């Protein structure tokens, strides 16, 4: 499943989806037109969608998330390891959600004002500095399942988020040379996403083929 970034929607992940489909992967939209919904509400909706897809496909899913999408992916992986076998984050400041450019901070303030003015369904001040923000932060610090495959792609040329905030210690870190907004369409980033998913495929096949007494040793090597 592909989750777009802050103030972006499913169309921004279309190029990534098309590439993955050409390579034989089945992709699913997050069903987000504009990613401005309260973080907790967005997470709950995504969790419901994950459950629906995982039940239909009878298998765990991998999430590829851009920016805020990657942060949502990490939260989902912490809550529902039964649904998720891997995540790939692209320019996602999971270690410090506030480590963003002031322009993005202004956008967040605008959403808060619109919410106070009566436009419902969007992020409020609580999402940036209240209980919602606190709960999201605590969730981002939850230890992940050791069997979860996690790749964090970051760029020192990001320009929007502090690249150091993207280096989740639970992830394998991959550096690229692109802008924040270019993450979802950059060919090099796409290659790294594809490589991460193929690695997951190979590991899944190895676990499925291995005798029961060898499965645990395979997991130890992976982690």
Predicted regions and their residues:
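Serine-dependent carboxylesterase/thioesterase catalytic core
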Residues: 1-11, 15, 21-139, 222
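Short, solvent-exposed amphipathic alpha-helical segments in soluble enzyme
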Residues: 17-18, 169
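Helical cap/lid subdomain of alpha/beta-hydrolase-fold lipid enzymes
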Residues: 78-79, 83-223
């Amino acid at each position: 499943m592909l989750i777009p970034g802050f103030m972006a929607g499913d169309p921004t992940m279309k190029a990534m989806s098309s590439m993955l489909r050409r390579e034989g992967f089945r992709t699913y939209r997050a069903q987000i037109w504009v990613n401005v919904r309260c973080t907790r509400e967005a997470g709950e909706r995504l969790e419901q969608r994950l459950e629906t897809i995982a039940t239909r496909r009878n298998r765990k899913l991998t999430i590829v998330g851009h920016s805020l999408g990657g942060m949502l992916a990490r939260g989902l992986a912490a809550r529902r390891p039964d649904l998720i076998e891997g995540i790939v984050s692209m320019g996602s400041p999971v270690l410090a959600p506030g480590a963003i450019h002031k322009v993005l901070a202004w956008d967040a303030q605008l959403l808060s004002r619109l919410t106070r003015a009566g436009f419902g369904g969007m992020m409020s001040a609580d999402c940036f500095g209240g209980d919602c923000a606190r709960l999201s932060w605590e969730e981002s610090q939850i230890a992940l399942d050791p069997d979860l495959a996690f790749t964090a792609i970051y760029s020192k040329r990001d320009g929007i988020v502090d690249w150091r905030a993207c280096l989740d210690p639970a992830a394998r870190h991959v550096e690229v040379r692109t802008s924040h907004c270019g993450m979802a369409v950059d060919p090099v980033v796409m290659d790294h996403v594809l490589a991460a998913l193929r690695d997951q495929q190979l590991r899944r096949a190895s676990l499925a083929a291995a005798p029961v007494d060898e499965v645990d040793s395979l997991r130890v090597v992976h982690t």
